[in-house]
């Protein structure tokens, strides 16, 4: 009997390997209604956030309202139409958010949603210690790879901890979701139900808000950053403006809770290369990303990025291990003693505590580190941001004892180690010129001698 030639043997082996590969990645997708049927009245449901907000499943969850009552929704920064946050669903779903994004701001301030003030670094402990035990987690992931692993993509943040502690896990599986290196891999066998969709991820554009004023602020902040520093940026136009002012710097690193489009060009030009970081050298470390599709495509399967758990990334003890750590954050207003309100306008809840204090403290105790608050001297409507006292009901996110540098378009005020009078003088010097006389008067009335 003639033996098969070498080519036939190789073809046969290849077909067997292909069959095994296909068997490994076979996925049984179900309908949204079937997946969501596990959710019952009086349960607590975690919703994935930021770019990965699972809008497709949320739309279908709203259709399940007729059978649900008192379902608590826990999330951080969600984007897009949530569908379940409408007043008509107030008896069915109750949002208990750990941050206030634009999508739920009206609901929180209208009284049919709630906000939990908490440091981002501590949110996983709320899940682990059963203070906020999760019954069901809904996450938005990439399809399984050859080994069955899906990725939480550009939103690992608190989602990893929610998955680790939830009793049931529902996955919205999307080929448009990027795969990232780090802590975001979850084997598909962990999911109790998987629903397929092809929605685009949520995007945000911070660069369009940058103007001459914010670029001036960016320039002053850039002047506080030395070569070989490791930087953290908050969300918004000012952190993005800072990145635009770093093109003459060398060998910068990134350890941040979030990143956006501004880092791409700096990475491409080798300005951000992470060479001199004390921990995770050669890696841009983040917990989530929010920006354009270009950003998500750039991060996709890019080993130069590591997306890690929020309780690690935002841990001040981890942050401080990078020497020359620079934390750059913004605020709503600052009083003349240095108290920083970043989450509210008076009693109006605008955002949340977030990770500002995590990084302000971590940078302060880093060797050569600098915690920076950067704000325009006035709002777009001409309202002063440096004020005698914070608005009644305003929340203090960063205490005056934690504030070191404050930057406006008029310069830099260094507050650490200064007494209250000295702080007031320093802050008045960077306030809007038209606000300084009134601030001087307030300081004289408060401190008597000024």
Please report, for each region that a protein language model flagged, where it lies by residue:
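Short hydrophobic alpha-helical segments enriched in small aliphatic residues
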Residues: 6-9
